[in-house]
Structure formats: structure tokens, C-alpha cells
């Protein structure tokens, strides 16, 4: 199995509402989340290790993973909020405003990491996840 390690979040995409008001529509996202979804849809064995909230947005993330054949057994569930990324589109270019302080994805600890990864044949790390995963790898090496 390929284990994707990184962020899962909700992209808040600007769209006009039915009454021509500006609003934001929530879409599951995050670079590593999207990669896991794509791999799962190709019917390859893939899992996601990410901090995911149990709030309504986290439920949306988990539903998308399940519908796309992504193993969620290494998801780190938390009652902390889901990271939100508000997207601003200017001339087709996206910029982001993140709300992620104390979120499920940012508050992962070494103790949250899985201890058995026998079925993992490859890892894919996102940049945001490397800090926590490096701590995990360092601790695992110390145990050997």
C-alpha cells in the first residue's frame, strides 16, 4: 500500500449564490489528500495518514476518502476543528488564507503515529507533514 502522509482540509471556494451574493462553498482538499484520492480512484492500494476532525467538515473528508477507495485506518481522528483554506482567485491565480491554529491536522503528536506499517510499500509525504513525521522516524530509529 502507498501511504500518503499530509494535510486534509476544506477549501472554501468563492462562488455566487442563487441570489447573486458572494459566498464560499466547501470542497475537500489538501495536496496529499487530493493525491490519495487520485491514487484510490485508479484502484491502487492507498491509505492516508492525516489528522482529521470529527466535525462536519471532517465527516465530509472521510466520506470522500471512503468513496474513492482510500484506506483510512491510519487517519488520526480528533475533536479539534478542520483546517479551512479560503481561496481567493485573481486572474486565474489562487491565493489562500488558512485557518488552522489548533486544528486536527496541526496538533498531531508522535504518540498519534501508527506503530505497525507492515503493509506499506511506499510513503508519500507532503511538506507540512514532514516535521511531525521526522520526529516519528527519529524516535523509531532510537528504539532500534
Residue ranges of predicted features:
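Glycine-rich phosphate/adenosyl-contacting loop at the front of the ribokinase-like
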Residues: 1-70
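Conserved N-terminal subdomain of the carbohydrate kinase-like
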Residues: 45-128
Amino acid at each position: 500500500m502507498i501511504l500518503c502522509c499530509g494535510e486534509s482540509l476544506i477549501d472554501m471556494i468563492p462562488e455566487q449564490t442563487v441570489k447573486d451574493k458572494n459566498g464560499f462553498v466547501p470542497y475537500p482538499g489538501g495536496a496529499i489528500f487530493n493525491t490519495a484520492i487520485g491514487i484510490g480512484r485508479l484502484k491502487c492500494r492507498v491509505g492516508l495518514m492525516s489528522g482529521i476532525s470529527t466535525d462536519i467538515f471532517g465527516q465530509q473528508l472521510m466520506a470522500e476518502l471512503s468513496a474513492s477507495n482510500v484506506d483510512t485506518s491510519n487517519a488520526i481522528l480528533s475533536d479539534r476543528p478542520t483546517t479551512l483554506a479560503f481561496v481567493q482567485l485573481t486572474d486565474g491565480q489562487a491565493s489562500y488564507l488558512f485557518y488552522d491554529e489548533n486544528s486536527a491536522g496541526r496538533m498531531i503528536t508522535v504518540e498519534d503515529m501508527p506503530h505497525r506499517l507492515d503493509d506499506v510499500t511506499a510513503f508519500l509525504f507532503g511538506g507540512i507533514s514532514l516535521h511531525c513525521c521526522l520526529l516519528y522516524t527519529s524516535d523509531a530509529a532510537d528504539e532500534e
